[in-house]
UniProtKB/Swiss-Prot annotation:
Residues 1-19 form the signal peptide. The keyword Ligase does not apply. This is Acid phosphatase-like protein XcAP-2. Its main location: secreted. The keyword Signal applies. One of its GO terms (cellular component) is extracellular region. It is found in: Secreted. InterPro entries: His_PPase_superfam (IPR029033). Keywords: Disulfide bond, Secreted, Signal. Lipids and biogenic amines bind independently through different binding pockets.
Protein backbone atom coordinates (compact mmCIF):
# COMPACT_ATOMS: atom_id res chain seq x y z
CA UNK A 1 0.00 0.00 0.00
CA UNK A 2 2.79 2.42 0.96
CA UNK A 3 4.54 1.59 -2.30
CA UNK A 4 1.38 2.39 -4.27
CA UNK A 5 0.93 5.73 -2.49
CA UNK A 6 4.58 6.61 -3.06
CA UNK A 7 4.23 5.75 -6.75
CA UNK A 8 1.15 7.98 -7.06
CA UNK A 9 2.99 10.86 -5.38
CA UNK A 10 5.95 10.44 -7.75
CA UNK A 11 3.64 10.33 -10.79
CA UNK A 12 1.85 13.47 -9.60
CA UNK A 13 5.16 15.29 -9.19
CA UNK A 14 6.25 14.18 -12.66
CA UNK A 15 2.99 15.41 -14.19
CA UNK A 16 3.29 18.74 -12.40
CA UNK A 17 6.87 19.13 -13.60
CA UNK A 18 5.67 18.61 -17.16
CA UNK A 19 3.01 21.31 -16.83
CA UNK A 20 4.23 24.37 -18.63
CA UNK A 21 3.06 27.92 -19.05
CA UNK A 22 3.67 29.13 -22.59
CA UNK A 23 4.21 32.81 -23.26
CA UNK A 24 1.54 34.02 -25.70
CA UNK A 25 1.70 37.80 -25.69
CA UNK A 26 3.68 40.75 -24.27
CA UNK A 27 2.33 44.23 -23.66
CA UNK A 28 5.30 46.66 -23.44
CA UNK A 29 5.01 50.22 -22.12
CA UNK A 30 8.33 52.02 -22.56
CA UNK A 31 9.55 55.44 -21.44
CA UNK A 32 11.54 57.47 -23.91
CA UNK A 33 15.29 57.51 -24.26
CA UNK A 34 17.41 60.66 -24.30
CA UNK A 35 16.01 63.67 -26.17
CA UNK A 36 16.89 67.35 -26.32
CA UNK A 37 16.43 69.19 -23.04
CA UNK A 38 13.12 71.02 -23.27
CA UNK A 39 10.28 72.75 -21.48
CA UNK A 40 7.45 70.40 -20.51
CA UNK A 41 3.73 71.26 -20.62
CA UNK A 42 2.57 72.96 -17.39
CA UNK A 43 6.22 73.62 -16.53
CA UNK A 44 8.42 76.75 -16.40
CA UNK A 45 10.54 77.99 -19.28
CA UNK A 46 14.06 76.64 -18.82
CA UNK A 47 15.25 76.10 -22.41
CA UNK A 48 14.36 77.42 -25.87
CA UNK A 49 12.84 74.10 -26.97
CA UNK A 50 9.26 73.05 -26.23
CA UNK A 51 8.54 69.38 -25.53
CA UNK A 52 6.73 68.59 -28.83
CA UNK A 53 9.73 69.97 -30.76
CA UNK A 54 12.38 68.08 -28.79
CA UNK A 55 14.20 65.57 -30.99
CA UNK A 56 15.91 62.37 -29.95
CA UNK A 57 19.63 62.86 -29.40
CA UNK A 58 22.13 60.58 -31.11
CA UNK A 59 22.45 58.69 -27.83
CA UNK A 60 18.66 58.47 -27.65
CA UNK A 61 18.43 57.04 -31.17
CA UNK A 62 21.06 54.44 -30.37
CA UNK A 63 19.36 53.52 -27.09
CA UNK A 64 15.97 53.14 -28.81
CA UNK A 65 17.46 50.82 -31.42
CA UNK A 66 19.27 48.78 -28.77
CA UNK A 67 16.07 48.51 -26.73
CA UNK A 68 14.38 47.00 -29.78
CA UNK A 69 17.19 44.47 -30.03
CA UNK A 70 16.79 43.66 -26.35
CA UNK A 71 13.06 43.04 -26.78
CA UNK A 72 13.70 40.73 -29.71
CA UNK A 73 16.39 38.81 -27.83
CA UNK A 74 14.12 38.46 -24.80
CA UNK A 75 10.94 37.42 -26.56
CA UNK A 76 11.39 36.22 -30.13
CA UNK A 77 11.98 32.54 -29.37
CA UNK A 78 9.75 32.52 -26.29
CA UNK A 79 6.84 33.79 -28.37
CA UNK A 80 7.56 31.33 -31.16
CA UNK A 81 8.26 34.08 -33.68
CA UNK A 82 10.31 33.03 -36.71
CA UNK A 83 10.47 36.48 -38.28
CA UNK A 84 9.16 39.77 -36.94
CA UNK A 85 6.58 41.34 -39.25
CA UNK A 86 4.62 44.47 -38.28
CA UNK A 87 1.71 43.30 -40.42
CA UNK A 88 1.56 39.96 -38.62
CA UNK A 89 2.99 39.64 -35.14
CA UNK A 90 3.91 42.93 -33.46
CA UNK A 91 2.50 46.43 -33.14
CA UNK A 92 4.52 49.53 -32.24
CA UNK A 93 2.51 52.66 -31.52
CA UNK A 94 3.00 56.12 -30.05
CA UNK A 95 1.10 59.34 -29.48
CA UNK A 96 3.23 62.19 -30.87
CA UNK A 97 5.88 62.54 -33.55
CA UNK A 98 8.96 62.38 -31.34
CA UNK A 99 7.74 59.09 -29.94
CA UNK A 100 6.70 57.76 -33.32
CA UNK A 101 10.33 58.23 -34.34
CA UNK A 102 11.44 56.38 -31.22
CA UNK A 103 8.90 53.63 -31.85
CA UNK A 104 10.18 53.31 -35.41
CA UNK A 105 13.76 53.00 -34.19
CA UNK A 106 12.77 50.42 -31.58
CA UNK A 107 10.97 48.53 -34.35
CA UNK A 108 14.15 48.62 -36.43
CA UNK A 109 15.99 47.07 -33.49
CA UNK A 110 13.32 44.41 -33.04
CA UNK A 111 13.58 43.27 -36.65
CA UNK A 112 17.40 43.53 -36.53
CA UNK A 113 17.98 46.11 -39.22
CA UNK A 114 21.43 47.66 -39.43
CA UNK A 115 22.19 50.20 -36.72
CA UNK A 116 22.79 52.76 -39.49
CA UNK A 117 19.00 53.26 -39.44
CA UNK A 118 19.53 55.50 -36.40
CA UNK A 119 20.72 58.24 -38.78
CA UNK A 120 17.94 57.66 -41.31
CA UNK A 121 15.33 60.31 -42.12
CA UNK A 122 11.96 58.62 -41.73
CA UNK A 123 9.14 59.34 -44.15
CA UNK A 124 5.74 60.55 -42.96
CA UNK A 125 4.28 57.23 -44.11
CA UNK A 126 6.75 55.23 -42.01
CA UNK A 127 6.06 57.39 -38.95
CA UNK A 128 2.31 57.19 -39.47
CA UNK A 129 2.45 53.41 -39.02
CA UNK A 130 3.32 53.91 -35.35
CA UNK A 131 0.86 56.74 -34.73
CA UNK A 132 -2.17 56.01 -32.55
CA UNK A 133 -4.00 59.31 -31.81
CA UNK A 134 -6.39 57.61 -29.35
CA UNK A 135 -3.45 57.45 -26.95
CA UNK A 136 -3.91 61.18 -26.45
CA UNK A 137 -6.97 60.47 -24.29
CA UNK A 138 -4.62 58.87 -21.76
CA UNK A 139 -3.04 62.32 -21.23
CA UNK A 140 -6.35 63.99 -20.36
CA UNK A 141 -5.79 63.82 -16.61
CA UNK A 142 -2.74 66.11 -16.65
CA UNK A 143 -4.45 68.87 -18.67
CA UNK A 144 -5.97 71.51 -16.35
CA UNK A 145 -8.52 72.44 -19.03
CA UNK A 146 -9.58 68.83 -19.62
CA UNK A 147 -9.39 67.47 -16.07
CA UNK A 148 -9.89 70.44 -13.71
CA UNK A 149 -11.52 68.41 -10.92
CA UNK A 150 -8.46 66.16 -10.60
CA UNK A 151 -6.01 69.07 -10.60
CA UNK A 152 -8.13 70.93 -8.05
CA UNK A 153 -8.26 67.82 -5.87
CA UNK A 154 -4.46 67.53 -5.87
CA UNK A 155 -3.94 71.21 -5.07
CA UNK A 156 -6.36 70.91 -2.15
CA UNK A 157 -3.79 68.66 -0.45
CA UNK A 158 -1.48 71.58 0.23
CA UNK A 159 -0.24 70.27 3.59
CA UNK A 160 0.86 66.98 2.01
CA UNK A 161 2.48 68.82 -0.89
CA UNK A 162 4.35 71.15 1.47
CA UNK A 163 5.62 68.16 3.46
CA UNK A 164 7.02 66.58 0.30
CA UNK A 165 8.58 69.77 -1.04
CA UNK A 166 10.05 70.54 2.36
CA UNK A 167 12.45 67.63 1.81
CA UNK A 168 14.10 69.51 -1.06
CA UNK A 169 13.59 73.04 0.21
CA UNK A 170 17.28 73.94 0.05
CA UNK A 171 17.60 72.68 -3.52
CA UNK A 172 14.48 74.55 -4.65
CA UNK A 173 15.76 77.76 -3.08
CA UNK A 174 18.93 77.52 -5.19
CA UNK A 175 16.95 76.66 -8.33
CA UNK A 176 14.67 79.68 -7.86
CA UNK A 177 17.69 81.97 -7.64
CA UNK A 178 18.44 81.01 -11.24
CA UNK A 179 14.88 80.35 -12.46
CA UNK A 180 12.33 82.43 -10.49
CA UNK A 181 9.47 80.98 -12.56
CA UNK A 182 9.82 77.70 -10.65
CA UNK A 183 6.91 78.29 -8.29
CA UNK A 184 4.39 75.43 -8.58
CA UNK A 185 4.44 71.92 -7.06
CA UNK A 186 4.72 70.15 -10.43
CA UNK A 187 7.67 72.37 -11.40
CA UNK A 188 9.97 70.42 -9.07
CA UNK A 189 9.45 67.25 -11.10
CA UNK A 190 9.51 68.97 -14.50
CA UNK A 191 12.69 70.97 -13.88
CA UNK A 192 14.41 67.87 -12.50
CA UNK A 193 13.74 66.05 -15.77
CA UNK A 194 14.89 69.08 -17.78
CA UNK A 195 18.02 69.61 -15.68
CA UNK A 196 18.87 65.92 -15.97
CA UNK A 197 18.93 66.19 -19.75
CA UNK A 198 20.85 69.46 -19.67
CA UNK A 199 23.56 67.86 -17.54
CA UNK A 200 23.68 64.76 -19.76
CA UNK A 201 24.00 66.99 -22.80
CA UNK A 202 26.66 69.14 -21.09
CA UNK A 203 24.77 72.43 -21.21
CA UNK A 204 26.77 75.49 -20.16
CA UNK A 205 26.40 77.59 -17.00
CA UNK A 206 25.26 74.74 -14.78
CA UNK A 207 28.15 74.80 -12.33
CA UNK A 208 25.69 75.67 -9.57
CA UNK A 209 23.60 72.54 -10.25
CA UNK A 210 25.42 70.13 -7.95
CA UNK A 211 24.88 66.40 -7.55
CA UNK A 212 23.36 67.06 -4.13
CA UNK A 213 20.78 69.43 -5.61
CA UNK A 214 19.90 66.87 -8.28
CA UNK A 215 19.58 64.15 -5.64
CA UNK A 216 17.15 66.30 -3.64
CA UNK A 217 15.13 67.18 -6.74
CA UNK A 218 14.96 63.52 -7.76
CA UNK A 219 13.66 62.48 -4.35
CA UNK A 220 10.95 65.15 -4.40
CA UNK A 221 10.06 64.35 -8.01
CA UNK A 222 9.53 60.70 -7.16
CA UNK A 223 7.35 61.53 -4.17
CA UNK A 224 5.25 64.28 -5.76
CA UNK A 225 4.46 62.25 -8.89
CA UNK A 226 3.64 59.07 -6.96
CA UNK A 227 1.49 61.07 -4.53
CA UNK A 228 -0.45 62.64 -7.42
CA UNK A 229 -1.04 59.26 -9.05
CA UNK A 230 -1.81 57.09 -6.02
CA UNK A 231 -2.96 59.11 -3.01
CA UNK A 232 -6.48 57.69 -3.37
CA UNK A 233 -8.24 54.99 -5.38
CA UNK A 234 -10.00 57.77 -7.28
CA UNK A 235 -6.69 59.36 -8.25
CA UNK A 236 -5.33 56.02 -9.43
CA UNK A 237 -8.47 55.55 -11.52
CA UNK A 238 -8.24 59.03 -13.07
CA UNK A 239 -4.50 58.84 -13.78
CA UNK A 240 -4.28 55.34 -15.22
CA UNK A 241 -7.77 53.90 -15.45
CA UNK A 242 -8.28 54.56 -19.16
CA UNK A 243 -5.05 52.77 -20.04
CA UNK A 244 -5.99 49.88 -17.76
CA UNK A 245 -9.38 49.56 -19.45
CA UNK A 246 -7.65 49.44 -22.82
CA UNK A 247 -5.29 46.72 -21.57
CA UNK A 248 -8.19 44.67 -20.18
CA UNK A 249 -10.01 44.96 -23.52
CA UNK A 250 -6.97 43.64 -25.38
CA UNK A 251 -6.22 40.84 -22.92
CA UNK A 252 -9.87 39.76 -22.77
CA UNK A 253 -9.87 39.37 -26.54
CA UNK A 254 -6.58 37.49 -26.60
CA UNK A 255 -7.56 35.07 -23.82
CA UNK A 256 -10.75 34.30 -25.75
CA UNK A 257 -8.82 33.55 -28.94
CA UNK A 258 -10.09 36.70 -30.64
CA UNK A 259 -8.09 39.36 -32.53
CA UNK A 260 -6.47 42.12 -30.53
CA UNK A 261 -8.45 45.29 -31.39
CA UNK A 262 -6.74 47.52 -33.97
CA UNK A 263 -3.56 45.42 -34.08
CA UNK A 264 -2.46 44.87 -37.71
CA UNK A 265 -1.78 41.21 -36.98
CA UNK A 266 -5.12 40.64 -35.26
CA UNK A 267 -5.22 37.26 -33.53
CA UNK A 268 -1.62 36.57 -34.59
CA UNK A 269 -0.20 39.59 -32.80
CA UNK A 270 2.42 38.61 -30.21
CA UNK A 271 3.72 41.92 -28.90
CA UNK A 272 2.38 45.44 -28.54
CA UNK A 273 4.79 48.27 -27.81
CA UNK A 274 3.59 51.62 -26.45
CA UNK A 275 6.21 54.36 -26.42
CA UNK A 276 5.03 56.96 -23.94
CA UNK A 277 6.27 59.85 -21.80
CA UNK A 278 7.25 59.32 -18.19
CA UNK A 279 3.90 60.49 -16.84
CA UNK A 280 2.09 57.60 -18.55
CA UNK A 281 4.56 55.06 -17.20
CA UNK A 282 3.82 56.43 -13.73
CA UNK A 283 0.05 56.33 -14.26
CA UNK A 284 0.32 52.80 -15.68
CA UNK A 285 2.28 51.68 -12.62
CA UNK A 286 -0.28 53.35 -10.35
CA UNK A 287 -3.09 51.06 -11.53
CA UNK A 288 -1.09 47.82 -11.44
CA UNK A 289 0.41 48.30 -7.96
CA UNK A 290 -2.48 48.45 -5.46
CA UNK A 291 -1.59 48.60 -1.74
CA UNK A 292 0.18 45.40 -0.71
CA UNK A 293 1.97 44.96 -4.04
CA UNK A 294 5.61 43.86 -3.94
CA UNK A 295 8.36 44.90 -6.33
CA UNK A 296 10.96 42.18 -6.05
CA UNK A 297 10.56 41.30 -2.38
CA UNK A 298 9.97 44.87 -1.21
CA UNK A 299 6.95 47.08 -0.72
CA UNK A 300 6.40 49.59 -3.51
CA UNK A 301 7.66 53.08 -2.67
CA UNK A 302 7.93 56.32 -4.61
CA UNK A 303 11.69 55.84 -4.83
CA UNK A 304 11.87 52.22 -5.98
CA UNK A 305 9.14 52.68 -8.60
CA UNK A 306 10.13 56.08 -10.13
CA UNK A 307 10.81 55.51 -13.85
CA UNK A 308 14.04 57.02 -15.12
CA UNK A 309 15.27 57.06 -18.74
CA UNK A 310 14.97 53.64 -20.32
CA UNK A 311 12.26 52.41 -17.94
CA UNK A 312 9.68 49.93 -19.19
CA UNK A 313 6.81 47.78 -17.94
CA UNK A 314 6.04 44.42 -19.57
CA UNK A 315 2.82 42.52 -19.02
CA UNK A 316 3.57 38.93 -20.03
CA UNK A 317 0.54 36.78 -20.79
CA UNK A 318 0.97 33.01 -20.38
CA UNK A 319 -1.28 30.10 -21.33
CA UNK A 320 -1.13 26.85 -19.37
CA UNK A 321 -1.75 23.28 -20.49
CA UNK A 322 -5.29 23.47 -19.12
CA UNK A 323 -6.19 26.63 -21.05
CA UNK A 324 -5.56 28.67 -17.91
CA UNK A 325 -4.17 32.16 -18.42
CA UNK A 326 -1.70 33.99 -16.19
CA UNK A 327 -0.08 37.44 -16.15
CA UNK A 328 3.43 38.30 -15.01
CA UNK A 329 4.47 41.94 -14.58
CA UNK A 330 8.12 42.72 -15.30
CA UNK A 331 9.53 46.16 -14.51
CA UNK A 332 12.84 47.87 -15.23
CA UNK A 333 13.05 51.33 -13.66
CA UNK A 334 15.83 52.68 -15.88
CA UNK A 335 18.99 52.07 -17.88
CA UNK A 336 21.32 49.62 -16.19
CA UNK A 337 18.69 48.56 -13.66
CA UNK A 338 17.80 44.88 -13.19
CA UNK A 339 14.49 43.34 -14.17
CA UNK A 340 12.13 43.03 -11.22
CA UNK A 341 8.82 41.24 -10.90
CA UNK A 342 5.81 43.14 -9.61
CA UNK A 343 3.58 40.77 -7.62
CA UNK A 344 0.00 41.75 -6.79
CA UNK A 345 -1.26 41.16 -3.24
CA UNK A 346 -2.35 37.55 -2.78
CA UNK A 347 -0.90 36.51 -6.13
CA UNK A 348 2.20 34.54 -7.15
CA UNK A 349 4.54 36.10 -9.71
CA UNK A 350 2.37 34.63 -12.45
CA UNK A 351 -1.08 35.73 -11.38
CA UNK A 352 -4.15 33.91 -12.78
CA UNK A 353 -5.68 36.32 -15.26
CA UNK A 354 -9.13 36.32 -13.68
CA UNK A 355 -7.61 37.16 -10.29
CA UNK A 356 -5.29 39.75 -11.88
CA UNK A 357 -8.33 41.43 -13.39
CA UNK A 358 -10.41 41.10 -10.23
CA UNK A 359 -7.74 42.82 -8.11
CA UNK A 360 -7.25 45.72 -10.53
CA UNK A 361 -10.80 46.14 -11.85
CA UNK A 362 -11.49 48.84 -9.24
CA UNK A 363 -9.20 51.20 -11.17
CA UNK A 364 -10.60 50.62 -14.67
CA UNK A 365 -12.84 53.37 -16.05
CA UNK A 366 -14.77 54.08 -19.24
CA UNK A 367 -14.10 57.17 -21.34
CA UNK A 368 -17.46 58.74 -20.43
CA UNK A 369 -16.95 58.11 -16.72
CA UNK A 370 -13.41 59.45 -16.97
CA UNK A 371 -14.67 62.69 -18.48
CA UNK A 372 -17.20 63.03 -15.67
CA UNK A 373 -14.56 62.34 -13.01
CA UNK A 374 -12.31 64.93 -14.64
CA UNK A 375 -14.98 67.58 -15.02
CA UNK A 376 -14.27 67.54 -18.76
CA UNK A 377 -16.07 70.51 -20.36
CA UNK A 378 -19.08 69.54 -22.47
Amino acid sequence: MKTTILLLVVLTIVQLSKAKDNLQFVFVTAKGQDHQACNYPQGPKITNIEEPDSELTEDGKKEAYEFGQKLSSEYKSRLGVTKWDSAQNYWAIAAIEKRTKKATLITAGVIAKRQSVTSKTWSDEELQKTSFPALNDFFRFINPQHCPKYIKSILSKQNDINTILGKCEAALKTVKEHYPAVNKPQHTWLVYETFKRMKQQKASNLEWLTDDIMKQLQACSAEITWFAATNSDEWRKISGGLLLTDIFTDLDQITQGKPQPYAPGGANNKMSLFTVPQVLVISHLAVITPPGTKIGSKDVTAQNIYPEDGAYVNLELFKGDKEDWKVKIVYVKGKGEPQQTIALPGCPEKCPYNKFKQILQQYAISDDDHKKACGFPA
